[in-house]
Amino acid sequence: QTNETQRERSSYMYSMRDGDLNRSMTQNNNQRVCDNICRGLSKLPHFNEDMERTFRQGLGVPGAIDAGINWYRANIPPVDAITDEDFWPGKHASTSVPSLLIWGDADLTFVSEFIDDLAGYAENLRVHHLPEVGHSPMLEQPVEVNAVIRHFLATGAG
């Protein structure tokens, strides 16, 4: 609510729910979404025709992206209307469960201050930073991400 940069970065969540952006995303079996994702992934050295075909097959099914859009509709009220009751499970909730966040430093979806603040909510948090990686580290650096997860699990996840 209070971080203006994050508000700007999150504005897509509101515009994709309805209206022109929603229609352009979902028309022609989500073609725009498929094109945008594949265009971004095509820059990766390990992205190949088989992977593109798989993405297009999965994302090209009518309704394939509806669940994500509906999640935004159901769970994120307009910023100016957010109240303490909108926070789930609660505004000051925390966990002691060992937690791992794999964070791409080039992620344009979330501001880095959010990552710094997570320690206040997850007391047993491990953050693994990936330089020059964006919002989808599991797609951009799958070998390293899998190694980090394996190490986290092998060391008692904490």
Cite the ranges covered by each PLM segment.
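Alpha/beta-hydrolase-fold serine-hydrolase catalytic core, especially in secreted/extracellular enzymes
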Residues: V143, T155-G158
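Flexible "cap/lid" subdomain of the alpha/beta-hydrolase fold that forms the substrate-access gate
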Residues: Q1-L125, H129, R150, G156
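Catalytic histidine-centered segment of alpha/beta-hydrolase-like enzymes
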Residues: V133-P142, N146
